[in-house]
């Protein structure tokens, strides 16, 4: 099995991941207040208790979404580091062939 890696493509993929991460973070930030704060429809105890429970679940969702965005951002950094590593190794390999042939 052969794996062909184009470092420039990895750099482009990393930039795309970073852009998606930024858009996703902005969307979550805009939605967080609406997800985490549920207003009870009435003043009775059942409505208030349910609103509190939904607010707790909404806050948990916001926290998990933030962790997901953070993980996506780390993935983009990893792709960029892989591309840089491939490019550096390719340059070393090319230099060894050029210096050995002279």
Curated annotation (Swiss-Prot):
The keyword Secreted applies. Its main location: secreted. GO terms for cellular component: cell envelope; cell surface; extracellular region. Residues 3-91 form the PE domain. It holds the Pfam family PE. Keywords: Secreted, Virulence. It is found in: Secreted; Cell envelope; Cell surface. Signal peptide: none annotated. It comes from the Bacteria. May play a pivotal role in the evasion of host immune response by M.tuberculosis. Mediates production of IL-10 via activation of the p38 and ERK1/2 mitogen-activated protein kinase (MAPK) signaling pathways. Belongs to the mycobacterial PE family. This is PE family immunomodulator PE15. It comes from Mycobacterium tuberculosis (strain CDC 1551 / Oshkosh). The lineage of its organism: Bacteria, Bacillati, Actinomycetota, Actinomycetes, Mycobacteriales. The gene is PE15.
């Amino acid at each position: 099995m052969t794996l062909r890696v184009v470092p420039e493509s990895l750099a482009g993929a990393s930039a795309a991941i970073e852009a998606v991460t930024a858009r996703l973070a902005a969307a979550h930030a805009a939605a967080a207040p609406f997800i985490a704060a549920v207003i009870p429809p009435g003043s009775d105890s059942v409505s208030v208790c349910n609103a509190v429970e939904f607010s707790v679940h909404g806050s948990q969702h916001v926290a998990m979404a933030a962790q997901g965005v953070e993980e996506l951002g780390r993935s983009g950094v990893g792709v960029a580091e892989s591309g840089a590593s491939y490019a550096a190794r390719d340059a070393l390999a090319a230099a060894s062939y050029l210096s050995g042939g002279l």
